[in-house]
Amino acid sequence: MGYFDRLRALSADRNTLLCVGLDPDPERIPGGAAGALRHCREVVRQTEEHVCCYKPNSAFWEQYGPDGWHALLELRDEAPQTPFLFDGKRGDMGNTMRAYALTVFATLAMDAATVNPYLGADSIEEFTRYEDRGVYVVCRSSNPGAASLQHLDVKGRPLYMHVAELAQGLNTHQNVGLVVGATAPAEIAEVRRSSQLPFLIPGIGAQEGDLEGSVRAAWNGDPASCLMSASRSVLFADKPSREAAKLKDGINAVVGALR
């Protein structure tokens, strides 16, 4: 079963569209890589029933050196039934991307990954050739400076709309999605009008993205269409299980009103 089918099945089974980011901060979590593993392992144990995916950002594990990679692999084993989405936003020449894809999908055994489209379609194809893995192309990101590049006018349309079109053309194996941030619900709606690809929507927690507006803009009836992601707001909550349940219920309430 491919990544997106697994995501749909788990979403239905757990009644959730929530993804939780696992991004340890050494300034808030003592003990190096071992401390990060302990903290994130507890978060996984508390939240797994409320999520359909976990999203470790590679930089937060790379900062610990080799111990960080080992810790991430151990964390992956903590929740084998839940997909892990490797948020590395890799983007490079084809041969390099081939090595990145091998690292992410074979060595680390991740179920999905984010990629950067700046080098064009041929670089992304090194990831999409793994037919049973998901590949989310960064389209309209959630950071404040995104518009300076992603909103550039290209032949009468913003650049992010061209990225959405490029991603659609790469979806031969039905394993491609888009990253569109919850801080830009109007842009999510614009992309959704032209594309029915699955969306990964980060930014509903500490970044204070628009949860309701984003779900309304993205939802198309497909459970994979609207994977809502929060990281710090859950990871550093006094009780991660309660925060995850709150987010899950909030998302479900919006979806319920749309059905």
Locate each region found by the language model.
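Acidic (Asp/Glu)-rich catalytic clusters
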Residues: 11-13, 44-50, 73-80, 126-131, ...
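Short, well-ordered coil/turn segments that N-cap beta-strands
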Residues: 14-18, 49-52, 80-83, 111, ...
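Conserved anion-binding
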Residues: 24-27, 92-179
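Active-site-adjacent beta->alpha loops and helix N-cap segments on the catalytic face
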Residues: 63-78, 93-97, 117-132, 183-193, ...
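A C-terminal functional module that forms or caps the active site or interfaces directly
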Residues: 178, 182-229
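C-terminal helical cap(s) of enzyme catalytic domains, especially alpha/beta-barrels
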Residues: 213-225, 234-259
